[in-house]
Amino acid sequence: MAIISSKKQPPEPNGQPNKRPESAPAAPKEKVLQPEAAIDEQGKQEESIRPQKFADYIGQKDLKDVLDIAIKAAKSRGEVLDHLLLYGPPGLGKTTMAMILASEMGVNYKITSAPALERPRDIVGLLVNLKPGDILFIDEIHRLSRMTEEILYPAMEDYRLDITVGKGSSARIRSIPLSKFTLVGATTRVGALTSPLRDRFGLIQKLRFYEVDELSQIVLRSAQLLQTQVTDDGATEIARRSRGTPRIANRLLKRVRDYAQVKSCTEVSQNIAAEALQLFQVDPCGLDWTDRRMLSVIIEQFNGGPVGLETIAAATGEDTQTIEEVYEPYLMQIGYLSRTPRGRTATKAAYKHMGFTPPNEQLSLL
């Protein structure tokens, strides 16, 4: 329930040391593997490569099938699409999917994020201005304040906004009807959502990491839109190093394009892509300096682990949330890192990739 004053307010402003490889990880040059959207990717060029319909959206077949059924059913009944919660690692296309839903339903959409909805009037202003069928996309929805969540409860269930006008004995509750809308929430931490909020979503879907062949198609499509010549092998080379994430694939493509242009290359071949990505310290498995530093700390300083998250964060200079949400999921997916109740451990594959020999006790377990 929102509390709104009737007075107008002014605007606010351990074991034996292992043999070290010949070359230790160098200091990072640029974080080209961070899946968070960069400033230069918020302009027209980013929008130009973003798919506008399901036919152009590569990958996530299971998700597209589920949403296609939901859209067709809602259209046939003349109803709005049910509220949808999308969760998964950053950069997999949650925002893009919300835009495609609006396009497929033939409605408008509004995009915001939970940290921007600090005060009740922030979310109230969005809700009262929604038109019938509109889609409201809230990114990082797990970071909503308790008061904002409580405003959303009746809005999601009954399309109603309950507000308290005035204070003290003169206060009164007023219900404002809202247009029927669809709330699409996105989060990287679905477990952080409160049960009352999570249970109000009719559809809860997970986005998975992409396969190399899917990312190759994304790279080729983006290259065509960016008017850049990329060979199939060049696209595959970029895709292999993109950590299963389309946003990273598109970012690496732009960096490789810059490299090819400066080197006067007419097209991006596999060799050119490999040379460019080596310059940016992205290895053939998609690991960057922070990934290698994490594995190096676990292997060299703690004999393979287990190591606590806070210790890894201190050694790499990253915060614990970034490590948990950005780096660990991919390292676990490719089998380089394991999470145990006692901490993080490096796997045999990680030892091999980093150029170390696993200790005997770990070899017996693997």
Curated annotation (Swiss-Prot):
Residues 211-281 are annotated as: Small ATPAse domain (RuvB-S). Its main location: cytoplasm. GO terms for molecular function: ATP binding; ATP hydrolysis activity; four-way junction DNA binding; four-way junction helicase activity. Residues 1-49 are annotated as: Disordered. ATP binds at I49, R50, G91, K94, T95, T96, E157, D158, Y159, R200, Y210, R247. It is an enzyme of class 3 (hydrolase). Its EC number is 3.6.4.-. DNA binds at R339, R344. GO terms for cellular component: cytoplasm; Holliday junction resolvase complex. Residues 284-366 are annotated as: Head domain (RuvB-H). Keywords: ATP-binding, Cytoplasm, DNA damage, DNA recombination, DNA repair, DNA-binding, Hydrolase, Nucleotide-binding. One of its GO terms (biological process) is DNA repair. Mg(2+) binds at T95. SMART domains: AAA (SM00382). It catalyses: ATP + H2O = ADP + phosphate + H(+). The keyword Amino-acid biosynthesis does not apply. The keyword Endoplasmic reticulum does not apply. Has 3 domains, the large (RuvB-L) and small ATPase (RuvB-S) domains and the C-terminal head (RuvB-H) domain. The head domain binds DNA, while the ATPase domains jointly bind ATP, ADP or are empty depending on the state of the subunit in the translocation cycle. During a single DNA translocation step the structure of each domain remains the same, but their relative positions change. PANTHER family: HOLLIDAY JUNCTION BRANCH MIGRATION COMPLEX SUBUNIT RUVB, PTHR42848. Homohexamer. Forms an RuvA(8)-RuvB(12)-Holliday junction (HJ) complex. HJ DNA is sandwiched between 2 RuvA tetramers; dsDNA enters through RuvA and exits via RuvB. An RuvB hexamer assembles on each DNA strand where it exits the tetramer. Each RuvB hexamer is contacted by two RuvA subunits (via domain III) on 2 adjacent RuvB subunits; this complex drives branch migration. In the full resolvosome a probable DNA-RuvA(4)-RuvB(12)-RuvC(2) complex forms which resolves the HJ. The RuvA-RuvB-RuvC complex processes Holliday junction (HJ) DNA during genetic recombination and DNA repair, while the RuvA-RuvB complex plays an important role in the rescue of blocked DNA replication forks via replication fork reversal (RFR). RuvA specifically binds to HJ cruciform DNA, conferring on it an open structure. The RuvB hexamer acts as an ATP-dependent pump, pulling dsDNA into and through the RuvAB complex. RuvB forms 2 homohexamers on either side of HJ DNA bound by 1 or 2 RuvA tetramers; 4 subunits per hexamer contact DNA at a time. This is Holliday junction branch migration complex subunit RuvB. It comes from Trichormus variabilis (strain ATCC 29413 / PCC 7937) (Anabaena variabilis).
